[in-house]
A protein has these predicted regions:
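Beta-strand-rich receptor-binding modules of extracellular spikes/adhesins
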Residues: 1-14
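Glycine-anchored, exposed beta-strand/edge motif detector
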Residues: 16-161
């Protein structure tokens, strides 16, 4: 209730709802998160995947870069705050994230995809599905506001031939 955290050393059973709140405040998020080690410098809002070294990297749908997603290595979520290379980074696996500076203006209700390429050096979800041969298509979530997304990765990854 005070904004802190509670640790449960055993199983927790919930008999009611778990409510995720949406916020208009820049940088706010709510949902299921996990802490990983960053394999490169990352910015809030960037889509990431787990690399073979166990660290998270920018996830791209182009099929050729070191961070390229594929059926065996999909994007897992979105970074909630900037992180330096080789540092702890919080990844939103499912939930809401508002980011005014790093997100473009999204169309409310639109499906968001793992980006084919970085935009202004940022690897944020994009409105257009990749469409080139060798690219991979993966839904990463949905736009619920011009600068707020619902992260809900679909782990189905389709390759364009």
């Amino acid at each position: 209730a005070d904004g802190g955290s509670t640790t449960f050393p055993q199983q927790l059973t919930i008999t009611k709802n778990i409510a995720l709140t949406q916020s208009d405040s820049d940088g706010d998020y709510s949902g299921v998160t996990a802490v990983f080690t960053s394999g490169e410098a990352l910015e809030a809002g960037e889509v990431v995947s787990i690399h073979t070294d166990g660290e998270v990297y920018k996830a791209l749908a182009d099929g050729t870069t070191s961070g390229a997603i594929n059926a065996d290595q999909p994007a897992i979520g979105v970074v909630v705050a900037d992180a330096a290379d080789d540092s702890d980074v919080i990844v939103l696996l499912q939930g809401f994230l508002t980011h005014n500076a790093n997100f473009p203006t999204y169309t409310v209700g639109a499906t968001l995809y793992v980006p084919e390429a970085e935009t202004s050096s940022k690897c944020v979800p994009e409105l257009d599905a990749p469409d080139s041969s060798g690219d991979f298509i993966q839904v990463i979530g949905y736009a619920v506001h011009a600068n707020r997304i619902f992260v809900n990765p679909d782990f189905t990854v389709i390759e364009i031939t």
